[in-house]
Protein backbone atom coordinates (compact mmCIF):
# COMPACT_ATOMS: atom_id res chain seq x y z
CA UNK A 1 0.00 0.00 0.00
CA UNK A 2 2.92 2.36 0.76
CA UNK A 3 6.56 2.72 -0.20
CA UNK A 4 9.35 4.66 1.52
CA UNK A 5 10.46 7.75 -0.44
CA UNK A 6 12.56 9.49 2.22
CA UNK A 7 13.92 8.74 5.68
CA UNK A 8 16.42 9.97 8.25
CA UNK A 9 17.53 8.22 11.44
CA UNK A 10 19.55 9.96 14.12
CA UNK A 11 21.39 8.29 16.98
CA UNK A 12 21.90 10.37 20.10
CA UNK A 13 25.54 11.47 20.34
CA UNK A 14 26.42 10.76 16.71
CA UNK A 15 28.31 12.96 14.26
CA UNK A 16 26.70 16.11 12.88
CA UNK A 17 24.85 15.68 9.60
CA UNK A 18 23.16 18.17 7.29
CA UNK A 19 20.19 17.89 4.93
CA UNK A 20 18.69 20.26 2.39
CA UNK A 21 20.09 22.69 -0.15
CA UNK A 22 22.40 25.28 1.37
CA UNK A 23 21.32 28.91 1.22
CA UNK A 24 17.92 28.18 -0.29
CA UNK A 25 14.98 27.99 2.11
CA UNK A 26 12.60 25.24 1.09
CA UNK A 27 9.83 26.81 3.20
CA UNK A 28 9.76 30.46 2.07
CA UNK A 29 12.04 30.37 -0.99
CA UNK A 30 14.60 32.99 0.05
CA UNK A 31 18.13 32.56 -1.27
CA UNK A 32 19.66 35.73 0.19
CA UNK A 33 22.82 34.63 2.07
CA UNK A 34 22.14 37.22 4.79
CA UNK A 35 18.90 35.39 5.68
CA UNK A 36 20.79 32.33 6.88
CA UNK A 37 22.78 31.75 10.04
CA UNK A 38 25.35 29.13 10.95
CA UNK A 39 25.10 25.63 9.53
CA UNK A 40 23.87 24.44 12.93
CA UNK A 41 21.23 27.16 13.24
CA UNK A 42 18.22 25.07 12.18
CA UNK A 43 17.56 21.62 13.65
CA UNK A 44 15.83 19.27 11.20
CA UNK A 45 14.14 17.56 14.17
CA UNK A 46 13.30 19.53 17.35
CA UNK A 47 16.22 19.98 19.74
CA UNK A 48 13.75 19.71 22.60
CA UNK A 49 13.11 16.09 21.60
CA UNK A 50 16.79 15.22 21.83
CA UNK A 51 18.17 16.11 18.39
CA UNK A 52 21.70 17.48 18.66
CA UNK A 53 23.16 16.28 15.37
CA UNK A 54 20.79 16.59 12.36
CA UNK A 55 20.53 20.08 10.88
CA UNK A 56 18.68 21.63 7.95
CA UNK A 57 20.70 23.79 5.56
CA UNK A 58 17.54 24.78 3.69
CA UNK A 59 15.84 26.69 6.52
CA UNK A 60 16.38 30.42 6.91
CA UNK A 61 16.60 32.28 10.22
CA UNK A 62 13.14 33.81 9.86
CA UNK A 63 11.44 30.45 9.29
CA UNK A 64 13.47 28.87 12.06
CA UNK A 65 12.23 31.54 14.48
CA UNK A 66 8.59 30.93 13.49
CA UNK A 67 8.91 27.18 13.71
CA UNK A 68 10.30 27.34 17.25
CA UNK A 69 6.78 28.11 18.50
CA UNK A 70 5.45 24.98 16.86
CA UNK A 71 8.25 22.84 18.27
CA UNK A 72 7.72 24.22 21.77
CA UNK A 73 4.05 23.18 21.59
CA UNK A 74 4.99 19.66 20.48
CA UNK A 75 7.45 19.27 23.37
CA UNK A 76 4.80 20.46 25.83
CA UNK A 77 2.31 17.95 24.40
CA UNK A 78 4.61 15.05 25.30
CA UNK A 79 6.35 16.64 28.28
CA UNK A 80 5.74 13.73 30.70
CA UNK A 81 7.38 11.29 28.28
CA UNK A 82 10.43 13.53 27.94
CA UNK A 83 10.81 13.86 31.70
CA UNK A 84 10.26 10.18 32.46
CA UNK A 85 12.53 9.16 29.58
CA UNK A 86 15.36 11.51 30.53
CA UNK A 87 15.41 13.15 27.09
CA UNK A 88 17.92 16.01 27.07
CA UNK A 89 16.79 19.08 25.16
CA UNK A 90 18.49 22.44 24.79
CA UNK A 91 18.49 23.10 28.55
CA UNK A 92 18.72 19.54 29.84
CA UNK A 93 15.81 17.28 30.77
CA UNK A 94 12.60 19.30 30.96
CA UNK A 95 10.44 19.49 34.05
CA UNK A 96 6.78 18.57 33.55
CA UNK A 97 4.44 20.91 35.41
CA UNK A 98 5.25 24.25 36.95
CA UNK A 99 6.54 24.56 40.48
CA UNK A 100 3.55 25.16 42.74
CA UNK A 101 1.07 23.31 40.49
CA UNK A 102 -0.85 20.26 41.67
CA UNK A 103 1.71 17.85 40.19
CA UNK A 104 5.32 18.15 39.07
CA UNK A 105 7.67 15.62 37.46
CA UNK A 106 11.41 16.22 37.70
CA UNK A 107 14.35 14.25 36.35
CA UNK A 108 17.63 14.23 38.25
CA UNK A 109 20.99 12.49 37.93
CA UNK A 110 23.09 11.55 40.94
CA UNK A 111 26.43 9.78 40.51
CA UNK A 112 25.44 8.66 37.04
CA UNK A 113 22.09 7.24 38.11
CA UNK A 114 18.72 8.57 36.99
CA UNK A 115 16.05 9.58 39.50
CA UNK A 116 12.45 10.68 38.95
CA UNK A 117 11.01 13.06 41.54
CA UNK A 118 7.22 13.31 41.73
CA UNK A 119 5.46 16.07 43.66
CA UNK A 120 1.68 15.77 44.05
CA UNK A 121 -0.33 18.13 46.21
CA UNK A 122 -3.75 16.54 45.71
CA UNK A 123 -2.74 13.41 47.54
CA UNK A 124 -6.26 11.98 47.38
CA UNK A 125 -5.77 11.62 43.63
CA UNK A 126 -2.92 9.14 44.15
CA UNK A 127 -3.89 5.62 45.07
CA UNK A 128 -2.17 2.27 45.06
CA UNK A 129 -3.48 -1.26 44.87
CA UNK A 130 -1.44 -4.20 46.14
CA UNK A 131 -1.90 -7.43 44.23
CA UNK A 132 -0.23 -10.83 43.78
CA UNK A 133 0.57 -11.54 47.46
CA UNK A 134 1.93 -8.07 48.14
CA UNK A 135 4.47 -8.39 45.32
CA UNK A 136 2.87 -6.04 42.80
CA UNK A 137 2.36 -2.36 43.52
CA UNK A 138 0.19 -0.30 41.20
CA UNK A 139 0.49 3.44 41.60
CA UNK A 140 -1.56 5.98 39.66
CA UNK A 141 0.26 9.29 39.23
CA UNK A 142 -1.93 12.23 38.11
CA UNK A 143 -0.17 14.67 35.78
CA UNK A 144 -1.29 18.17 34.90
CA UNK A 145 1.77 19.10 32.90
CA UNK A 146 1.88 22.05 30.55
CA UNK A 147 -0.75 23.51 28.29
CA UNK A 148 -0.07 23.44 24.56
CA UNK A 149 -1.77 24.70 21.40
CA UNK A 150 -2.78 21.57 19.44
CA UNK A 151 -2.55 23.19 16.00
CA UNK A 152 0.95 24.44 16.70
CA UNK A 153 2.06 20.95 17.78
CA UNK A 154 0.57 19.51 14.59
CA UNK A 155 2.44 22.08 12.51
CA UNK A 156 5.70 21.04 14.17
CA UNK A 157 5.11 17.54 12.81
CA UNK A 158 4.14 19.00 9.43
CA UNK A 159 7.39 20.99 9.32
CA UNK A 160 9.42 17.86 10.08
CA UNK A 161 7.68 16.00 7.25
CA UNK A 162 8.20 18.84 4.77
CA UNK A 163 11.90 18.95 5.71
CA UNK A 164 12.28 15.46 4.26
CA UNK A 165 9.66 15.49 1.48
CA UNK A 166 11.32 15.31 -1.96
CA UNK A 167 11.22 18.72 -3.67
CA UNK A 168 9.46 17.26 -6.72
CA UNK A 169 6.39 16.69 -4.51
CA UNK A 170 6.19 20.31 -3.32
CA UNK A 171 3.82 21.34 -6.12
CA UNK A 172 1.14 19.20 -4.46
CA UNK A 173 1.70 20.73 -1.01
CA UNK A 174 1.79 24.49 -1.50
CA UNK A 175 -0.97 25.06 1.06
CA UNK A 176 0.92 22.98 3.61
CA UNK A 177 4.06 25.07 3.07
CA UNK A 178 2.20 28.37 3.14
CA UNK A 179 0.39 27.64 6.40
CA UNK A 180 3.71 27.41 8.23
CA UNK A 181 4.34 31.10 7.50
CA UNK A 182 1.22 32.27 9.39
CA UNK A 183 1.23 31.09 12.98
CA UNK A 184 -2.51 30.33 13.28
CA UNK A 185 -3.22 29.08 9.74
CA UNK A 186 -4.23 25.49 9.05
CA UNK A 187 -3.08 23.52 6.00
CA UNK A 188 -6.67 22.90 4.94
CA UNK A 189 -10.31 22.64 5.97
CA UNK A 190 -10.09 19.17 7.48
CA UNK A 191 -9.33 17.62 10.90
CA UNK A 192 -5.65 17.77 11.80
CA UNK A 193 -5.35 14.19 12.92
CA UNK A 194 -2.38 12.69 14.71
CA UNK A 195 -1.71 9.04 15.46
CA UNK A 196 0.30 8.79 18.69
CA UNK A 197 2.04 5.70 20.09
CA UNK A 198 4.66 4.97 22.72
CA UNK A 199 7.31 2.47 23.82
CA UNK A 200 9.69 2.07 26.76
CA UNK A 201 8.24 4.80 28.97
CA UNK A 202 10.80 5.71 31.60
CA UNK A 203 13.85 4.83 29.52
CA UNK A 204 13.72 6.59 26.17
CA UNK A 205 15.55 4.79 23.33
CA UNK A 206 18.41 7.07 22.18
CA UNK A 207 17.15 7.54 18.64
CA UNK A 208 15.07 9.86 16.47
CA UNK A 209 13.84 9.30 12.95
CA UNK A 210 11.33 10.23 10.30
CA UNK A 211 10.01 8.15 7.41
CA UNK A 212 7.97 9.52 4.51
CA UNK A 213 5.59 6.96 2.99
CA UNK A 214 3.95 7.38 -0.42
CA UNK A 215 0.85 5.58 -1.65
CA UNK A 216 1.60 2.89 -4.23
CA UNK A 217 -1.76 2.90 -6.00
CA UNK A 218 -3.45 6.22 -6.77
CA UNK A 219 -6.90 4.63 -6.55
CA UNK A 220 -6.46 3.39 -2.97
CA UNK A 221 -8.69 5.41 -0.58
CA UNK A 222 -5.78 6.32 1.70
CA UNK A 223 -3.68 9.51 1.99
CA UNK A 224 -1.04 10.02 -0.69
CA UNK A 225 1.66 10.81 1.89
CA UNK A 226 2.00 9.67 5.50
CA UNK A 227 4.87 10.85 7.69
CA UNK A 228 5.96 8.86 10.72
CA UNK A 229 8.21 10.57 13.25
CA UNK A 230 9.75 8.77 16.22
CA UNK A 231 11.54 10.49 19.09
CA UNK A 232 12.75 8.18 21.81
CA UNK A 233 9.73 6.60 23.48
CA UNK A 234 7.11 8.48 21.43
CA UNK A 235 6.00 8.09 17.82
CA UNK A 236 3.69 10.28 15.71
CA UNK A 237 2.06 9.85 12.33
CA UNK A 238 0.25 12.42 10.22
CA UNK A 239 -1.16 12.50 6.70
CA UNK A 240 0.03 15.22 4.34
CA UNK A 241 -3.13 15.95 2.42
CA UNK A 242 -3.01 17.14 -1.17
CA UNK A 243 -6.00 18.67 -2.97
CA UNK A 244 -4.73 17.12 -6.19
CA UNK A 245 -3.75 13.65 -4.95
CA UNK A 246 -6.34 13.07 -2.20
CA UNK A 247 -9.64 14.16 -3.75
CA UNK A 248 -11.05 10.65 -3.35
CA UNK A 249 -9.86 10.25 0.26
CA UNK A 250 -12.14 10.99 3.20
CA UNK A 251 -11.25 14.00 5.35
CA UNK A 252 -11.24 11.90 8.52
CA UNK A 253 -8.89 8.94 8.27
CA UNK A 254 -7.52 6.60 10.91
CA UNK A 255 -3.76 6.79 11.30
CA UNK A 256 -3.24 3.29 12.61
CA UNK A 257 0.14 2.02 11.39
CA UNK A 258 1.77 0.01 14.20
CA UNK A 259 5.40 1.07 13.91
CA UNK A 260 8.53 -0.94 14.69
CA UNK A 261 12.08 0.31 14.33
CA UNK A 262 15.53 -0.96 15.26
CA UNK A 263 18.22 0.35 17.57
CA UNK A 264 21.81 -0.59 16.84
CA UNK A 265 23.61 -2.50 19.60
CA UNK A 266 27.22 -1.53 20.47
CA UNK A 267 28.31 -5.12 19.93
CA UNK A 268 26.57 -5.31 16.55
CA UNK A 269 23.13 -6.43 15.38
CA UNK A 270 19.94 -4.53 16.21
CA UNK A 271 17.38 -4.38 18.99
CA UNK A 272 13.71 -3.93 17.93
CA UNK A 273 11.64 -1.06 19.32
CA UNK A 274 7.93 -1.77 19.08
CA UNK A 275 5.51 1.12 19.51
CA UNK A 276 1.94 0.71 20.74
CA UNK A 277 -1.19 0.82 18.61
CA UNK A 278 -1.74 4.52 17.83
CA UNK A 279 -4.08 6.67 19.89
CA UNK A 280 -6.02 9.07 17.65
CA UNK A 281 -5.91 12.80 18.41
CA UNK A 282 -7.45 15.78 16.62
CA UNK A 283 -5.01 18.66 16.95
CA UNK A 284 -6.99 21.23 14.96
CA UNK A 285 -7.70 23.57 17.87
CA UNK A 286 -6.09 26.92 18.64
CA UNK A 287 -7.19 27.07 22.28
CA UNK A 288 -4.47 26.00 24.75
CA UNK A 289 -5.23 22.74 26.51
CA UNK A 290 -3.49 20.42 28.95
CA UNK A 291 -1.16 17.81 27.49
CA UNK A 292 -3.19 14.73 26.44
CA UNK A 293 -2.45 12.40 29.37
CA UNK A 294 -4.11 12.84 32.75
CA UNK A 295 -2.08 10.20 34.58
CA UNK A 296 0.56 7.50 34.35
CA UNK A 297 0.06 4.18 36.09
CA UNK A 298 3.23 2.58 37.44
CA UNK A 299 3.16 -1.18 38.01
CA UNK A 300 6.13 -2.17 40.15
CA UNK A 301 7.30 -5.56 41.40
CA UNK A 302 8.78 -5.16 44.89
CA UNK A 303 10.85 -8.36 44.57
CA UNK A 304 12.37 -7.87 41.12
CA UNK A 305 12.38 -4.02 41.30
CA UNK A 306 11.15 -3.98 37.70
CA UNK A 307 8.24 -1.84 36.62
CA UNK A 308 6.42 -0.29 33.68
CA UNK A 309 4.41 2.86 33.03
CA UNK A 310 1.01 2.90 31.34
CA UNK A 311 -0.26 6.30 30.10
CA UNK A 312 -3.92 7.15 30.71
CA UNK A 313 -5.37 9.49 28.10
CA UNK A 314 -7.27 12.55 29.24
CA UNK A 315 -10.99 12.65 28.56
CA UNK A 316 -11.89 14.85 25.60
CA UNK A 317 -14.18 17.00 27.77
CA UNK A 318 -11.31 18.08 30.06
Language-model features: where?
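Short, flexible, mixed-charge glycine/proline-rich loop motifs
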Residues: 10-22, 49-54
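Short cysteine-rich clusters marking metal-coordination/redox-active sites
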Residues: 25-28, 60-63
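Internal, well-ordered alpha/beta segment that forms a basic, Gly-enriched binding/recognition surface
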Residues: 64-159
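Charge-dense, low-complexity intrinsically disordered regions
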Residues: 145-318
Amino acid sequence: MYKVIAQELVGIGGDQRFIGEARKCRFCGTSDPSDFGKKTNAHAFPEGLGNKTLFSLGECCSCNSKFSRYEDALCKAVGPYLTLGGVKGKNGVRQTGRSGSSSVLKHEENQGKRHIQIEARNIEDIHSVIKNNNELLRLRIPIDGDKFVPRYAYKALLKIALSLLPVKEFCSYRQNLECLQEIDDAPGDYPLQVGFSYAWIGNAPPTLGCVILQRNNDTDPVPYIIAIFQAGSVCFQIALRSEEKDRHVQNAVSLSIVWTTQLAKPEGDFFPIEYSSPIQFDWSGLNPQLQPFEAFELTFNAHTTQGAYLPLARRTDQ
